[in-house]
Amino acid sequence: MALRFPRFSQGLAQDPTTRRIWFGIATAHDFESHDDITEERLYQNIFASHFGQLAIIFLWTSGNLFHVAWQGNFESWVQDPLHVRPIAHAIWDPHFGQPAVEAFTRGGALGPVNIAYSGVYQWWYTIGLRTNEDLYTGALFLLFISAIFLIAGWLHLQPKWKPSVSWFKNAESRLNHHLSGLFGVSSLAWTGHLVHVAIPGSRGEYVRWNNFLDVLPHPQGLGPLFTGQWNLYAQNPDSGSHLFGTSQGAGTAILTLLGGFHPQTQSLWLTDIAHHHLAIAFIFLVAGHMYRTNFGIGHSMKDLLDAHIPPGGRLGRGHKGLYDTINNSLHFQLGLALASLGVITSLVAQHMYSLPAYAFIAQDFTTQAALYTHHQYIAGFIMTGAFAHGAIFFIRDYNPEQNEDNVLARMLDHKEAIISHLSWASLFLGFHTLGLYVHNDVMLAFGTPEKQILIEPIFAQWIQSAHGKTSYGFDVLLSSTSGPAFNAGRSIWLPGWLNAVNENSNSLFLTIGPGDFLVHHAIALGLHTTTLILVKGALDARGSKLMPDKKDFGYSFPCDGPGRGGTCDISAWDAFYLAVFWMLNTIGWVTFYWHWKHITLWQGNVSQFNESSTYLMGWLRDYLWLNSSQLINGYNPFGMNSLSVWAWMFLFGHLVWAIGFMFLISWRGYWQELIETLAWAHERTPLANLIRWRDKPVALSIVQARLVGLAHFSVGYIFTYAAFLIASTSGKFG
């Protein structure tokens, strides 16, 4: 009996129904709830699993490098990055038949291949890789690192190498290691790579292990560093006529503040990027040494937090008690980490297209669209996760006595005001935005487009003007040619910035109008509503007006009838579940907006977006329907083409998405009856009744069925949009 799944819970292992399997899967990673768990084992298991996670990441990236080196066309792409389509890997068995083989043979390949829309070619090219041998070397190196991490993970589970709980709770040493050791040193190392390998590579100089000690990255070597003449490293930058990867028009500078973009590659100057990483390294190396570790100097985190009490006395006890609360709660720490990582991931999406760092990636439109959408979806899932673990913190780890009148307690005291304000903002945004869209829609339908309500986003335009955009005629700050800031910007700092802002060949400070104003507020509605649901879920996790006693019911209690006033949809889990739908909805609006605006920019018909985005039918007809034409083609006399796989995925994504509703809109009793009927029929059917099972089949619980429904909804939604995005963009631009 002891060997039945799940081994971590004897109670579940003895459950006679299929609930054993589902609950086992659901709680496999909830280490806190496992039998015989101690705080020490909990921390050690999580620590060891981090090494496994890193090993998988390095193995995966190694696989990317290996497959491109083996089956890709990196070397021919390097010769002509704008016209050769980068190959991700070969397709072993293209479906169906000879037409498929022909459709997928592209990018100069001899057989069927997949095109890469991940941007790895541009990244590898920018950082100095040039040959397949370079890629193989990188793949082997990462494979080696992966093995090291696997060994390290195993090692830290051995009795002699297991760290103690006190080691895990030593916050200052961890800050020292993470800030200085990981962020600081890795940023410094990356600066070194850019200066010693990537920048010479961009100037046609091939630096590798055999010659990197002989090639001076800068003609004056380390002289300017030791004599304090650091400005010499910025002199003689690459010229505007520089051809990337060659010495033609190249300079000698290694650390610059040029601003703007390299005219040929449309990406940030590599010397600016190196300078940025050096600054980051300096900041983090200093930051990591501000806290008191073994030497008795520096700040104590506990003292810092306890001293953070707002003067005047009307705002409570500030951060008092937070140190122990955070340091003893893994859920709080995970919540903070996820919130930070989620914001950073969304910022990556925003900056990868507006300030592209990799050579020629800005001209690879499908890759730009794929990377933006990918990072926004990832950010959404990570950010909702932050609130989920925040709610679990309140249920499992929050101690009211320890946090009396501090910022956490005051958040709970004021939760009604917080929730009602968020609710008001969401209602205001929703009704006004929808009202404008619907009004405009009706005006178009009745043939009186001039009666639309069109609002110019003057505040946003003013902000863009303040940063140097001249087309609105605001004549303020950096867009005012007579101002001191403008004149300083021509010479002292970032001289390329103003050119970049006012050029139409990039996505920096796009011109905005009434369509942008409306969709901006639609997105604001989505963000505020998602936040409302998540914040309410976390703040009401321990107890709410309807049910003040939630603590002992945990995170995901199900509907429990009318007792205690009814518990349907009031667990923290239910709030998270509802918020994910709103998150997906919001990111849908964000990506629709980004994609449609960029498609019209890239095609040179931006007036289509401007005119059609102010009413609902415009979005449905001129964005969704018009761009899905290649995906809803069905069978035609011309046979298949290279977009057929996306057409199939578009259909399949809709199917998966629709299956979600089968779990979301049905009652548990219906499933239980269906299961009983099927089991009864099975047991009375010859041959079939030879197969028996030990577990009595029972329907999923309400919470489980919602999870299965949500998973299908999310996966189907993303599959559908991914197929639409890649097919509609690559169909137009290759």
From Swiss-Prot:
InterPro entries according to UniProt: PSI_PsaA/B, PSI_PsaA/B_CS, PSI_PsaA/B_sf, PSI_PsaB
Keyword terms: 4Fe-4S, Chlorophyll, Chloroplast, Chromophore, Electron transport, Iron, Iron-sulfur, Magnesium, Membrane, Metal-binding, Oxidoreductase, Photosynthesis, Photosystem I, Plastid, Thylakoid, Transmembrane, Transmembrane helix, Transport
Binding-site residues for phylloquinone, renumbered to this chain: 671
Compartment list: Plastid, Chloroplast thylakoid membrane
Residues passing through the membrane, by range: 46-69, 135-158, 175-199, 273-291, 330-353, 369-395, 417-439, 517-535, 575-596, 643-665, 707-727
Bilayer topology: Multi-pass membrane protein
GO molecular function annotation: 4 iron, 4 sulfur cluster binding; chlorophyll binding; electron transfer activity; magnesium ion binding; oxidoreductase activity
Residues that hold [4Fe-4S] cluster according to the record: 559, 568
Stated role: PsaA and PsaB bind P700, the primary electron donor of photosystem I (PSI), as well as the electron acceptors A0, A1 and FX. PSI is a plastocyanin-ferredoxin oxidoreductase, converting photonic excitation into a charge separation, which transfers an electron from the donor P700 chlorophyll pair to the spectroscopically characterized acceptors A0, A1, FX, FA and FB in turn. Oxidized P700 is reduced on the lumenal side of the thylakoid membrane by plastocyanin.
NCBIfam families: psaB (TIGR01336)
Name of the protein: Photosystem I P700 chlorophyll a apoprotein A2
Organism: Coffea arabica (Arabian coffee)
